[in-house]
Design a protein with these regions (language model features):
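Phosphate/NTP-binding elements of NTP-utilizing enzymes
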Residues: 1-331
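Short acidic, Gly/Ser-rich segments with clustered Asp/Glu that frequently serve as metal-coordination loops
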Residues: 333-335
Length: 335
C-alpha cells in the first residue's frame, strides 16, 4: 500500500479481476505461410486463444480503493507478464494519474518478498559494470520501467492528442466521469491499442476505466454511460466490455445505512461507515454540497448545480439610479 503496509486483496478486487482474466474464447484465423524456399505459400488455419474482456468500466463510490485496483492490474502487467508491455495511467489531472503509480513506487522502496527483492537489488547508477548488478525495476523520469522485460508504465494527460496512437497493452483511466473532457479518452486509447490485433500472436489489450459518479453533465461521461446502459439492458450485445456499476436505486435509501453497501462494496474495509454518516449529515446541513455528495458517495448523479444564498443576499435592495453619472466604454478593435 502507499503507506508501506502489506496489501491484502479485497474480495471485490478478486471478483473484478476474475471477470477480466477468467474468460477466454478461441478464434480460428487463416494465416498466410510462405514456403521455406521463399517461392509461393499457402493459407493455414490457426486457433488463437483470446481474452474475452478488453475493457472494464468500474463506477463505484469514493473510498472504494479504485486507484489501488488499477495499480494492482498495472503491477501485474509490469512484473508478472513477461512480454514487453507499454502501459499508461491517465486521469483529468496529473496528480490523480500519479495515484496509480505511487503504490508501485512504495512496493519498490519496501522490496518485500522474493520477486521484489530480486527486481530491486543493485543500483540504477551502475551503468558501466555488469548488467546483473543493475536494478531491474526502477522509477525513472519516464515512469516505472522494468528493465528485464523492457516494459514501461507511464503517466499521460487525459487529452486526445496525447493518447492517440499508443500501442498500449494495459491502460487505466481514472475519474473519467469527473473530468470536464469533451472527447472520449477511452476510445482514443482503444484505437491505438487495437492496432496490433491482426497478427496471430495473442496480444490482448486491457483498458480499466474507474470512476466515481460525476456532477459534470456536458462532458463525455454521459454518452459513455448511455452506451453502458444499453449493454446492461441487452439492447446491444458486447461481451468484450465488463461493467461494474454500483449505485443506490433511490434517493430515499441515503438515510438507510444498510443500503450504503450497494454504492460501495468495500464499505467497512477501505472506508468507514462513520465517514459516510458524516457525509450524509453534511449534505443535509449544507445544501451547496448536496449534489456532489450524492454523486460521489452514493452514485446518484444530480442534474444542474445547487446555489446557496445567504439571508442577506435574498433581501430586496433599493432601486439604483445611474442618471448623469460618468460612464466608461471599451472596445477590442484588434479583430
Amino acid at each position: 500500500l502507499t503507506d508501506g503496509s502489506d496489501l491484502f486483496l479485497l474480495d471485490s478486487f478478486k471478483l473484478w479481476a476474475e471477470d477480466v482474466f477468467g474468460w477466454y474464447y478461441f478464434e480460428e484465423r487463416s494465416v498466410y505461410e510462405p514456403y521455406k524456399d521463399g517461392h509461393g505459400g499457402r493459407y493455414v488455419k490457426k486457433r488463437i486463444k483470446k481474452r474475452l474482456r478488453k475493457k472494464q468500466y468500474l463506477i463505484v463510490a469514493r473510498g472504494a480503493a479504485k486507484s489501488m485496483y488499477g495499480s494492482c492490474i498495472q503491477d501485474f502487467f509490469l512484473n508478472v507478464d513477461t512480454t514487453t508491455t507499454h502501459q499508461i495511467a491517465t486521469a483529468p489531472t496529473m496528480k490523480q494519474s500519479e495515484e496509480v503509480l505511487s503504490p508501485i513506487k512504495t512496493a519498490i522502496t519496501r522490496s518485500r518478498g522474493p520477486l521484489f527483492k530480486f527486481l530491486t537489488e543493485g543500483s540504477i547508477q551502475n551503468t558501466t559494470g555488469s548488467k546483473a548488478k543493475r536494478q531491474k525495476l526502477v522509477p525513472t523520469k519516464r515512469g516505472i520501467e522494468n528493465l528485464l522485460t523492457g516494459s514501461l508504465l507511464e503517466i499521460r494527460p487525459m487529452r486526445i492528442d496525447k493518447l492517440q496512437g499508443l500501442r498500449v497493452k494495459c491502460a487505466t483511466v481514472d475519474e473519467w466521469l469527473s473530468g470536464d473532457v469533451a472527447e472520449d479518452p477511452i476510445e482514443a486509447i482503444e484505437q491505438g491499442a487495437a492496432k496490433e490485433q491482426s497478427t496471430t500472436s495473442n496480444n490482448d489489450y486491457l483498458i480499466i476505466a474507474t470512476s466515481s459518479e460525476g456532477t459534470v453533465r456536458n462532458g463525455v461521461g454521459d454518452t459513455i454511460k448511455m452506451e453502458l446502459m444499453k449493454i446492461l439492458k441487452g439492447e446491444y450485445y458486447n461481451p468484450h466490455v465488463s461493467i461494474w456499476w454500483y449505485k443506490l436505486d433511490d434517493i430515499d435509501e441515503v438515510g438507510n445505512p444498510e443500503m450504503w453497501i450497494k454504492a460501495n462494496p468495500n464499505i467497512g474495509k477501505t472506508v468507514t461507515y462513520e465517514t459516510y454518516q458524516l457525509a450524509v449529515e453534511r449534505a443535509e446541513n449544507n445544501p451547496s454540497q448536496r449534489n456532489d455528495i450524492l454523486a460521489k458517495r452514493f452514485g446518484i448523479p444530480m442534474e444542474g448545480y445547487t446555489y446557496f444564498f445567504t439571508y442577506e443576499e435574498t433581501k430586496p435592495h433599493r432601486k439604483q439610479e445611474f442618471w448623469k453619472l460618468p460612464c466608461a466604454l471599451g472596445a477590442d478593435l484588434s479583430q
